[in-house]
Amino acid sequence: MKLVFASNNAHKLREVREILPSHIEVLSLQDIGFVGDIAETGATLEENSAIKARAVWQWMSLHSSPETATVNGVFADDTGLEIAALQGAPGVHTARWAGEPACDAANRQKALQALQGITLRDARFRTVVTLIMTGEMQQVEGFVNGKIALEESGKGGFGYDPIFIPEGYNQTFACLTEEQKNSISHRGRAMQALCRLLNDLKQ
């Protein structure tokens, strides 16, 4: 099976390829010749995930090529960090919370500064995945509960990984191995849900 992942984020692409089983070949936007960014204008993770998947699906319908001829579908994800003490922020604004252009380090510092002096540091990561096959759209999601650390630690991962401590652990995502993170992360769980959906669609 061939699926196009509707994202220009190289970190996400690598994680998705590591998580999904080997019988699912994940193509990048570069692989199919799609150039440019997709404006994420939705008010929710569900809307933004759908916007990205639809944009690439519609583009493929207008740009037939040997690369797209064998593609079975398109999927996209949108991920949000939801911090309880901040009423669910940054949420849909997670990637660009500190402003344009998107900067992981600046986003992390904004989170730490916003929680200075606050003991309630509960948070969760949520990923919504949109799948389009034969024109039909379906969505699944995955999430992981945790808390925001007092300071950055760890050198792995990306984004908010150095400040997010998943439930049941005393280290941030950035301190875990990729295998450990992928087995419990929001994106890992969303990809597991995607696999279950794909299996259901085959039956």
Where are these regions (language model features)?
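Anionic-ligand binding patches
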Residues: 2-4, 10-203
